[in-house]
Amino acid sequence: MKKGMIGILLVLAVLVAPGASQAKGSKPIVIGCPLSTAFLYGWDAERGIKLAVEEINAQGGVNVGGVKRPFKVVVMDTRDLEPGVPVSEALMVVEKLILEKKADFILGGPVRSEAALAAMDLLARYKKISILTTGVLTPKYHRRVAENYNKYKYCFRITNEAANMVKNEMVPFIEQLGAKCGVHRMFVMAQDVAHARAGTGIIKKIMEKKGWEIAGYEIYPTGTTDYSQGLLKAKKAGKGVLLVWMDMPESTILLKQWRELRVPMIPFGFICAVEQPGSWKATGGAVEYAMTDVCNAGNAPSEATPWTMKFYRAYTKRWGVEPEGYGTSSSYMAVYVLKDAIERAGTLKADKVIKALEATDMMGVYGRIRFDPKSHQVIPALDPKEGAVTSIFQWQAPGKRVVVYPASIAVGEVKLP
């Protein structure tokens, strides 16, 4: 009798135990993350990815054809946002993640557009699926996929891109600012990198055609620490919109000088210094009235979808800081989208996961997530029910980031100095 009972208990143990621990004991799915970790768009992406992985693993992992497997994150520093670092260094990191770290998928970067474009050939060579989640605003990325699908079908982007940002988000918003200010004048200050030159160049042409006065157009090398000469020119021009497009931390200096010089133009654009929740304190309130496009909802507080504040609170609790800027919510969301695709594919085989990703249709932190099946670019919208929605916020006293655009998710209105 005793032997019989022991036998039954052993059988039950074999049947029950795997269901409880299978994800931990199974071979992990390795996510390789090439990120510029010393910069905002690198570390916030890393935190977003790790938060999602922790949540998914705590729930049992990923169901791959009936077997639960955990995600494992491997982050390596590409240094591609640092001045003077060659693209080749980022490529070496991507290759190392694939060959040495045995990454099953690449998520995150490279972050700089030039590096990500160069990495596309590596991803194609090794047939490795990549989902860009941060940086890389150049429209060349998804256009290249559409032009040569068979070669670049492994490349996806789950975040916004410059052409859509400019034409469908920033230009309409600049027009609203012009109407509010009562002046159709703009002064441009851009970083000397591909996405900033392209983005501001397109905006300049569009606004000129709309009859706006372009009072100046200044380009600054990455790492510039003095913007006073350009700001003095802007001050001389009078009221208007100060369009700033910079992803470097030194843009903090620009905002401080803007306030010190009392430039009457209101800052708006894609501005690294404005994004972070600590910007108000770091600049002594110099960011007041400044506005930035953080590309995706969830990078500033709003009720875009039921996911948005759930993510916002979870990130804040996990990292002790609110979501910090562009790349945060999209990096978090990419892990859930990848999980969903793997589970529908029932395998890690690239061709089947690609087809599953192309069929993605799920609500997320910043709206409905779908990919264009030809270009693998996430489909944008101004309504989160229809697609991936952006978020433009303004710093307002006493130190809050207030989402002011688009109207579908806005929690406040633009205030003028």
Regions inferred by a protein language model and the residue ranges of each:
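Extracytoplasmic "Venus flytrap"
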Residues: 32-50, 76-83, 87, 110-112, ...
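Extracytoplasmic ligand/sensor domains, especially the bilobed periplasmic-binding protein
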Residues: 103-217, 266-292
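Beta-alpha junction/loop-to-helix N-cap segments that form part of ligand/metal-binding clefts
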Residues: 26, 40-47, 62-146, 158, ...
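Short, low-complexity disordered leader/linker segments with a strong preference
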Residues: 1-30, 98-100, 417
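Segments of small-molecule ligand-sensing domains
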Residues: 315-325, 339-404
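Immediate post-signal peptide segment of exported/extracytoplasmic ligand-binding proteins
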Residues: 20-32, 63-72, 175-185
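Extracellular/periplasmic periplasmic-binding protein-like sensory domains
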Residues: 160, 258-332, 343, 404-413
